[in-house]
UniProtKB/Swiss-Prot annotation:
Residues 1-99, 171-172, 229-233, 296-331, 396-397, 454-461, 513-560 are cytoplasmic. The keyword DNA damage does not apply. It is found in: Cell membrane. The modification Phosphoserine is found at residues 56, 541. The lineage of its organism: Eukaryota, Metazoa, Chordata, Craniata, Vertebrata. It comes from the Eukaryota. This is Choline/ethanolamine transporter FLVCR1. GO terms for molecular function: choline transmembrane transporter activity; ethanolamine transmembrane transporter activity; heme binding; heme transmembrane transporter activity; virus receptor activity. Ethanolamine binds at residues 214, 471. GO terms for biological process: erythrocyte differentiation; erythrocyte maturation; heme export; mitochondrial transport; phospholipid biosynthetic process. It comes from Felis catus. Gene3D superfamilies: MFS general substrate transporter like domains. CDD domains: MFS_FLVCR1.
Length: 560
């Protein structure tokens, strides 16, 4: 037994005040198990050391005596996860049970409802672009007007993401879901009143409402996964939630060319077909809105993971939305991920919006084939999303997986670019599928990686910022690629995207992998988080002369 005394170095000295009643051990301490038991009253401490020498102990004690340095900006909010007084205990500490966790069967219902109304919203995003030439003829507008029916989704997201994420963080998951589903339903019904050739502004109004609904939809997958699903299924749940949006885009590529064929010589038939598509969409959106009201709940009775339990038990009064945003932008790995996610997702949005124009440049009159190629692109991406989700749940290898998928997305874009004009439709189907598999499969990877490196910040805030970056890059890429496609050729526009994707690879390689949420779950499960009482040498009042606690936490995974 070795006692920490003045010869070895005081465990706590004047000028080194505890943080929230706890003293944080610096990350570079020597390995070895440290257990402690309180003996001879609250001030005496005996440490049983396995594999730790007295010299190492002295070095550790000396480190504790140094003045405490401020936490890094991205780590400040972690203090709200710790108990605030010496009388409280850390989850997983020896002698105290971890918070009760359980998985609710309702989680599958919540996930299904969200995926379905997200599907309808994505369908309404792409339903104009995939038959852009048909709507140009019906409304008598230019191709740029039809492109804006897609880009309005991206434009609306940027200014509205901050109030939307604030609402999610302060008012909760259910209200955000109700707004997303309700506005999606309202926008669908407004478009039903636009089936006349002079009412383009009405269809734009309906599309604007749907774009506002999207703001309350895109940031929810990672929040739903974290709040409702356990550590071993959270990545798969996030991928499934993203899958609903991708499936909507896939159906948006498939159904409009079938429901609204190009019958410009018969305007009445064309109006009837457009009306059928609009009324069918609004009926489904209304049904899903009612399901959301009835069955979508805020959270389960018990948290599904220790990380979620720690967040739910943190004092809500200490949470600051502005501080959370500030911490995220000071987190260098997250800023790099923000840029790289925006590049690859913006490229996908641009390709999806302009796919019909690219295909019809080389394959005249093949609107249905263009829709099927878009369907292939998105369906392949759905498979990629699910496989990536399973892979992350199984391995927890975020950085390497993200980098590999990014590289393969770049290669897929290069192959698609230089095979598009060969005149072989089957080649375009195959290359489009390869491109979609990796590019769309990246989406849940970005969400989950962001949650890991920004924990304990809100999942909705990090996801919302990622989507905002995607919308900004999507608008810029769509305008630039559309201009290059019109003035030069589709190949020129695609090469433009290839250059940006290559830049994204370089930035992804620079991201430091710091899996905070995963380390919290693993640390508690393995008992790696220890609470070690130490002698308090500071002159306090008799009531304050109690043992302090050193929280020893597992070090974060280092960068590659």
């Amino acid at each position: 037994m070795v006692k920490l005394n003045d010869e070895e170095g005081a465990a706590m000295a004047p000028g080194h005040q505890p943080t929230n009643g706890y003293l944080l051990v610096p990350g570079g301490e020597p390995p070895g198990k440290v257990s402690a038991e309180l003996q001879n009253g609250p001030k005496a401490v005996c440490l049983t050391l396995n594999g730790v020498s007295r010299d190492s102990l002295a070095a550790a004690a000396e480190a504790l005596c140094r003045p405490q340095t401020p936490l890094a900006p991205e780590e400040e909010t972690q203090t709200r996860l710790l108990p605030t007084g010496p009388g409280e205990e850390t989850p997983g500490t020896e002698g105290s049970p971890a918070p009760q966790t359980a998985l609710s069967a309702r989680r599958f219902v919540v996930l299904l409802i969200f995926s379905l109304y997200s599907l309808v919203n994505a369908f309404q995003w792409i339903q104009y672009s995939v038959i852009s030439n048909v709507f140009e003829g019906f409304y008598g507008v230019s191709s740029l007007h039809i492109d804006w029916l897609s880009m309005v989704y991206m434009l609306a997201y940027v200014p509205l993401i901050f109030p939307a994420t604030w609402l999610l963080d302060t008012r909760g998951l259910r209200l955000t879901a109700l707004l997303g589903s309700g506005l999606n339903c309202l926008g669908a019904w407004v478009k039903c009143a636009s089936v006349q050739q002079h009412l383009f502004w009405v269809t734009m109004l309906g599309q604007c409402l749907c774009s506002v609904a999207q703001v309350f939809i895109l940031g929810l997958p990672s929040r739903i996964a974290s709040v409702w699903f356990g550590p071993k299924e959270v990545s798969t749940a996030c991928a499934t939630a993203v899958l609903g949006n991708q499936l909507g885009a896939a159906i948006g590529f498939l159904l409009p060319p079938v429901l609204v064929p190009n019958t410009q010589n018969n305007t009445d038939l064309l109006a009837c077909n457009i009306s059928t598509m609009f009324y069918g969409t609004s009926s489904v959106a209304t049904f899903l809105c009612f399901l959301t009201i009835i069955a979508f709940k805020e959270k389960p009775q018990y948290p599904p993971s220790q990380a979620q339990a720690a967040l739910q038990n943190s004092p809500p009064a200490k949470y600051s939305y502005k501080k959370s945003i500030r911490n995220l932008f000071r987190n260098v790995p997250f800023v790099l991920l923000l840029i790289t996610y925006g590049i690859i997702t913006g490229a996908f949005y641009s390709v999806s919006t302009l796919l019909n124009q690219m295909i019809l440049t080389y394959y005249k009159g093949e609107e249905v084939s263009a829709g099927k190629i878009g369907l292939t692109l998105v369906v392949a991406g759905m498979v990629g999303s699910i496989l990536c989700g399973f892979w992350l749940d199984y391995t927890k290898i975020y950085k390497q997986t993200t980098l590999i998928v990014y590289i393969l997305s770049f290669l897929g874009m290069v192959i698609f670019t230089f095979t598009l004009d060969l005149g072989y439709g089957i080649v375009v189907f195959v290359t489009g599928g390869v491109l979609g598999f990796f590019m769309t499969g990246y989406l849940p990877l970005g969400f989950e990686f962001a949650v890991e490196i920004t924990y304990p910040e809100s999942e909705g805030t990090s996801s919302g910022l990622l989507n905002a970056a995607a919308q900004i890059f999507g608008i810029l890429f769509t305008l630039a690629q559309g201009k290059l496609t019109t003035d030069y050729s589709p190949k020129a526009g695609n090469i433009f995207l290839c250059v940006w994707l290559f830049l994204g690879i370089i930035l992804t390689a620079l991201i430091k992998s710091d899996l905070r949420r995963h380390n919290i779950n693993i640390g508690i499960a393995n008992g790696d988080i220890k609470a070690v009482p130490v002698e308090d040498t500071v002159e306090d009042s008799p009531t304050d002369k109690e043992s302090k606690t050193i929280v020893m936490s597992k070090q974060s995974e280092s960068a590659i």
